Structures are given as C-alpha cells and as structure tokens.
Design a protein with these regions (language model features):
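Nudix hydrolase/Nudix homology domain
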Residues: 30, 99-139
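Active-site-adjacent beta-strand/loop module that shapes the phosphate/pyrophosphate-binding cleft
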Residues: 3, 12, 71-94, 106, ...
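A structure-centric signal for secondary-structure junctions around beta-strands
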Residues: 5, 14, 29-30, 79, ...
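Conserved Nudix-box catalytic region and its N-terminal flanking loop in Nudix hydrolases
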Residues: 16-56
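Conserved N-terminal beta-strand and adjoining loop/helix that marks the start
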Residues: 1-18, 39
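A short coil-to-beta-strand element that immediately follows conserved catalytic motifs
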Residues: 61-70
Length: 139
C-alpha cells in the first residue's frame, strides 16, 4: 500500500517561506529543515491533511481550498504531495506555535532557501521541494 505524505509551502505577504527545523528526537531526519505536513489519514484528502498538519505543527489555521497543488512525486512506497498557500500577513503578524516535532522555525526568502546547504542524508521530499523551486526561479 502506498503511503501519502502531504506538505505545505507557506508564503507570507513579504514573499518569505516558513521553514521548520525538525527536533533532535524526531524519528526521521532529526535537526533537518522541513515543511509543515505529514501522512494523509484514510478519511482525508491530501488538501485536508495538509491543512490539518499545518495547524497541528505550527498553530496556523488555513483553509484547504486556499492550497494550490505544486507537485506530486513518488519515492519508494510514498507519494509526496506539495501544496503552496499565500497568507496575506507578515511574519510579525503570524503566531507560530511549534509542535513537539520541531524545535524552531524561520521565515526565508526564496534566495535564502535555495542557498541553504542540503546534507546528502536529507529527506527526499525536501530535496524535491528545493529542486522544484530552483526550476521555477530559473524559468
């Protein structure tokens, strides 16, 4: 059975993206950069799962209809779905409340995000996101 993981790239009014740092005790890729998201549960769509996970991991409430699908990638037995949502607020207007899964967060410009050092052992999902954004920035 294929597992579906749904994540959201959150962009604020200033064009900065919300990046999370996984906690040191996270079972997968501890300490690595991440986006809010997680597994799609049986009764959910990938959009509703992304909205739920954003709220659980950051405290930010978004509506699933505001999510725009950017890509779907298959890696081994997992289907990765990435959405984007624009929030008409600045980072100082957005209260981020992290769950146990993450230890800190940072708002980054696209160039900061693309210049981030990606370890060889990075989550394939995160590598897909960076590759996708690089492709867009070159277009």
């Amino acid at each position: 059975m294929v597992k579906i993981v749904s994540k959201a790239l959150i962009k604020n009014r200033n064009g900065k993206y919300l990046l999370l740092y996984r906690g040191d005790t996270h079972p997968n890729f501890p300490g690595h950069l991440d986006l809010p998201g997680g597994e799609v549960e049986s009764e959910e769509t990938s959009k509703t799962a992304a909205a739920r996970e954003v709220q659980e991991e950051t405290g930010i409430c978004i509506h699933p209809n505001g999510l725009k699908k950017l890509f779907v990638k298959q890696y081994k037995n997992t289907r990765h779905v990435l959405f984007e949502i624009a929030i008409d607020k600045t980072e100082s207007d957005i209260s981020v409340k992290l769950s146990w899964e993450h230890k800190k967060y940072r708002w980054m410009t696209l160039s900061e995000l693309l210049d981030t050092n990606i370890p060889e052992s990075a989550d394939p999902y995160y590598i897909y996101v960076i590759d996708y954004l690089k492709h867009l920035s070159e277009a």
